[in-house]
From Swiss-Prot:
Its membrane topology: Multi-pass membrane protein
Lineage: Bacteria, Pseudomonadati, Pseudomonadota, Gammaproteobacteria, Enterobacterales
Entry GO terms, CC: plasma membrane
Keyword terms of this UniProt record: Cell inner membrane, Cell membrane, Membrane, Transmembrane, Transmembrane helix
Family: Belongs to the UPF0266 family.
Primary location class: membrane
Coiled coil: none
Transmembrane intervals: 6-26, 46-63, 67-87
Protein name: UPF0266 membrane protein NT01EI_1718
InterPro entries according to UniProt: DUF986
Cellular localization per UniProt: Cell inner membrane
Length: 156
């Protein structure tokens, strides 16, 4: 097994671990998911370039009669990348105490303000940063608004 094969295997394992965490573990962490909202996919061109480069590498490896194991690893990485970039939806998961955005848990107490922009972005102001959340379906913004009103923390 060459160094290239080891690197490809590491990337495949990391992609698969991320997919398992994102689809199976994160929805069960920190209590049950009360609301799940699909977000708009970003970086479509970047992911298409990545998958295209992998396809070129598979073609070159086959035409240069490279190792079959390397071809298999490249093809597997391409399939996993297609799943991660095109079949899986980025999501916003609302829990009892906070929400997951970008695989990071944010407690509701950290929210300082919320606004809705004209172009459909939900802007959430935190202590030190601002989140720009763009949902896949604009009707989801109404669901988020209703959910946050219902689960608003009462002052002590």
């Amino acid at each position: 097994m060459s160094l290239t094969d080891i690197a490809l295997l590491v990337f495949i394992v990391l992609f698969l671990l991320y997919a398992i965490y994102d689809e199976a573990i994160m929805p069960r962490q920190r209590s049950a998911t009360l609301l799940r909202v699909n977000l708009k996919r970003r970086n479509k061109a970047d992911s298409l370039i990545f998958i295209g480069l992998l396809a070129i590498l598979v073609y070159r490896n086959i035409s240069d009669q490279g190792a079959p194991f390397t071809t298999w690893l490249l093809a597997t990485l391409m399939v996993v990348a297609i799943y991660i970039f095109y079949l899986r939806w980025p999501k916003l998961l609302f829990k009892q105490q906070g929400f997951y955005y970008g695989n990071v848990f944010i407690d509701y107490a950290r929210i300082r303000g919320m606004n809705l922009s004209e172009d459909g972005f939900l802007v959430i102001d935190l202590e030190k940063r601002r989140l720009l959340i763009q949902v896949a379906n604009l009707d989801s913004l109404d669901e988020i608004f209703k959910f946050l009103l219902e689960h608003q923390q009462k002052p002590a």
